[in-house]
């Protein structure tokens, strides 16, 4: 049994520091690197690609809406062709730095509102998937388990990775509880670890209302901007190892 452990990184920009990338990156197997729209900038992207390469961590593009103020977590009404170019543009930006450092981009994971809209809306999901395929059909598209983003990616011919969240609660339909709700984020380390182990070993998660739902766990996300991110990653890794679960980057 194996699983990938990923984290959203490279989200600082300009004079604003963000997250504990240098402490977290040795503990993960895949990094989702912000591409300058919801967070990150050219200097941070360059440094984060370099850092990921140094630690043998899989490099992923993390495209989002052009929304620094809202950190890419606000829904923006865009046509599918606009979503397509939005994603392709950001993949191009990260590709430049991957070439500079002679390392290949391994995967793509949309950020925030774009990720959630792609999980629910078939046209948006298709636009994201088609953009990724047209830029590089060998890339793995990461999406919320059992959602339209995964099925549309498979339909266009992409490899996929179904993602689960260590630090988020679930609705009974498999969607994430909205961050607007006070209990959307799990701050208790033990609760997060127990949720992860159940998802990976049993392919089940307990929803907010107590419902047991099926879930596919190819990769586990811990948010790099979370207050407990470093503690979560460290202890989740330790527990998975004790459970005999191999932690391996996407694609092996």
Curated annotation (Swiss-Prot):
Gene Ontology biological process terms in this record: carbohydrate metabolic process
InterPro entries found in the cross-reference section: Glyco_hydro/deAcase_b/a-brl (IPR011330), LamB/YcsF/PxpA-like (IPR005501)
One Pfam family matching this protein: LamB_YcsF
Nucleotidyltransferase keyword on record: no
Residues annotated as transmembrane: none
EC number: 3.5.2.9
Catalytic activity annotation: 5-oxo-L-proline + ATP + 2 H2O = L-glutamate + ADP + phosphate + H(+)
Claim: Hydrolase is one of the keywords in the record: yes
This protein's UniProt keywords: ATP-binding, Hydrolase, Nucleotide-binding
GO molecular function, one term: 5-oxoprolinase (ATP-hydrolyzing) activity
Taxonomic superkingdom: Bacteria
Enzyme kind, highest EC tier: hydrolase
Similarity field: Belongs to the LamB/PxpA family.
HAMAP family referenced in this protein's UniProt entry, alphabetically: PxpA
Function: Catalyzes the cleavage of 5-oxoproline to form L-glutamate coupled to the hydrolysis of ATP to ADP and inorganic phosphate.
PANTHER family tied to this protein: 5-OXOPROLINASE SUBUNIT A, UNCHARACTERIZED PROTEIN YBGL-RELATED
Self-association and partners: Forms a complex composed of PxpA, PxpB and PxpC.
Protein name (Swiss-Prot/TrEMBL): 5-oxoprolinase subunit A
Organism per entry: Staphylococcus carnosus (strain TM300)
Protein's gene: pxpA
């Amino acid at each position: 049994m194996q699983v990938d452990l990923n984290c959203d990184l490279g989200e600082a920009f300009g004079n604003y520091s963000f997250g504990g990338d240098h402490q977290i990156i040795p503990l993960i197997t895949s990094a989702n690197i912000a591409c300058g729209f919801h967070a990150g900038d050219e200097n941070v992207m360059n440094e984060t690609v370099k850092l990921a390469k140094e630690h043998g961590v899989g490099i992923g593009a993390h495209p989002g809406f052009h929304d620094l103020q809202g950190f890419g977590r606000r829904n923006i009404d865009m046509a599918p062709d606009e979503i397509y170019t939005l994603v392709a543009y950001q993949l191009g930006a990260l590709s430049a730095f991957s070439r500079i450092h002679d390392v290949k981009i391994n995967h793509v994971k949309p950020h925030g509102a774009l990720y959630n809209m792609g999980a629910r809306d078939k046209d948006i999901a298709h636009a994201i998937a088609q953009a990724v395929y047209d830029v590089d059909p060998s890339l793995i598209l990461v999406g919320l388990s059992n959602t339209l983003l995964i099925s549309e990616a498979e339909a266009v011919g992409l490899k996929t990775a179904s993602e689960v969240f260590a630090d988020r609660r679930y609705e009974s339909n498999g969607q994430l509880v909205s961050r607007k709700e006070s209990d959307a984020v799990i701050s208790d380390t033990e609760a997060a670890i127990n949720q992860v182990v159940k998802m990976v070993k049993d392919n089940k998660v307990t929803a907010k209302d107590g419902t047991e739902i099926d879930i596919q766990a190819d990769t586990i996300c811990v948010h790099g901007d979370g207050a407990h991110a470093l503690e979560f990653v460290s202890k989740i890794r330790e527990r998975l190892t004790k459970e005999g679960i191999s932690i391996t980057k996407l694609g092996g």
